[in-house]
Amino acid sequence: MNLLPSNPHGNGLLYAGFNQDHGCFACGMENGFRVYNTDPLKEKEKHEFLEGGVGHVEMLFRCNYLALVGGGKKPKYPPNKVMIWDDLKKKTVIEIEFSTEVKAVKLRRDRIVVVLDSMIKVFTFTHNPHQLHVFETCYNPKGLCVLCPNSNNSLLAFPATHSGHVQIVDLANTEKPPVDIPAHEGVLCCITLNLQGTRIATASEKGTLIRIFDTSAGQLIQELRRGSQTANIYCINFNQDASLICVSSDHGTVHIFAAEDPKRNKQSSLASASFLPKYFSSKWSFSKFQVPSGSPCVCAFGTEPNAVIAICADGSYYKFLFNPKGECSRDVYAQFLEMTDEKI
């Protein structure tokens, strides 16, 4: 969740995002960066710079390397540079410079992937990174890009040059033709892979439908309806076994859908009527909860299979529990920016 150019809450938070397995989340601040354990909530690292904001923090599971990009009113690093921070040495150890602003960075143990506004560059994750690939995209100001973290799957997915399409390439075999998925008619707003890299979920700027595709052939597996009104989708995430997804938007609601068993999702009693528009056959979330503040948030599943965590731009942390009937209750609330590493 990128909160640049300005966070209306005035708390210094510029960025919040989960690591690959959602076990941690990192925050970029106007004066440094922080790392938290997701569930249970605990501050793990806090680095404050005398002067300098961090607009993007990308973790690599729980290892000591993080990718940082400068941001905010006084960026710590130039926004056209990717800095790899070694948390054991407490300093940057790799620096990659570009001619334009960096929109996002993705990491896996052997690759650094840098997203610019109309291209994606792939480098070796070595002390002197070597550029391996360049992929063109459509205009991509949000820096949409997902990299499968699985050691047996090297898929990279990003917006294709054709608006609304997703391109999936296998970094282990770039000779293989990419998979092109005509996911939406409108501009893409959000894309995410499951941990295994077998499924991709997408949403467009309209934000009413979430589509799930098979990554090997690009076949549509499910179409899920978030709502009937346009919404800005902030985040989509699968759970560990890709049986569920959670979705957050600017309506202040987090929706939970069944990704594998469509019968769990709600459907209109008029769904079987063939003369009615497709809308009536839509599959709706089986559970949802309102983030009390209505603040922008990112969401992910917690350590328990029936828990969803929301990390909000106003510094609030929520843990909600849902049951098979779809009933939801708030389990934990905290202000994570006000924590210290002693407090849980």
UniProtKB/Swiss-Prot annotation:
GO terms for cellular component: cytosol; lysosome; phagophore assembly site; phagophore assembly site membrane. It is found in: Preautophagosomal structure; Lysosome. WD repeats lie at residues 183-223, 228-267. InterPro entries: PROPPIN, WD40/YVTN_repeat-like_dom_sf, WD40_repeat_dom_sf, WD40_rpt. A motif (L/FRRG motif) lies at residues 224-227. Coiled coil: none annotated. One of its GO terms (molecular function) is phosphatidylinositol-3-phosphate binding. SMART domains: WD40 (SM00320). Pfam families: PROPPIN. Keywords: Autophagy, Lipid-binding, Lysosome, Repeat, WD repeat. Its main location: other. GO terms for biological process: autophagosome assembly; autophagy of mitochondrion; cellular response to starvation; glycophagy; nucleophagy; pexophagy; protein localization to phagophore assembly site. Belongs to the WD repeat PROPPIN family. The L/FRRG motif is required for recruitment to PtdIns3P. Component of the autophagy machinery that controls the major intracellular degradation process by which cytoplasmic materials are packaged into autophagosomes and delivered to lysosomes for degradation. Binds phosphatidylinositol 3-phosphate (PtdIns3P), and other phosphoinositides including PtdIns(3,5)P2, forming on membranes of the endoplasmic reticulum upon activation of the upstream ULK1 and PI3 kinases and is recruited at phagophore assembly sites where it regulates the elongation of nascent phagophores downstream of WIPI2. This is WD repeat domain phosphoinositide-interacting protein 3. It comes from Danio rerio (Zebrafish). The gene is wdr45b.
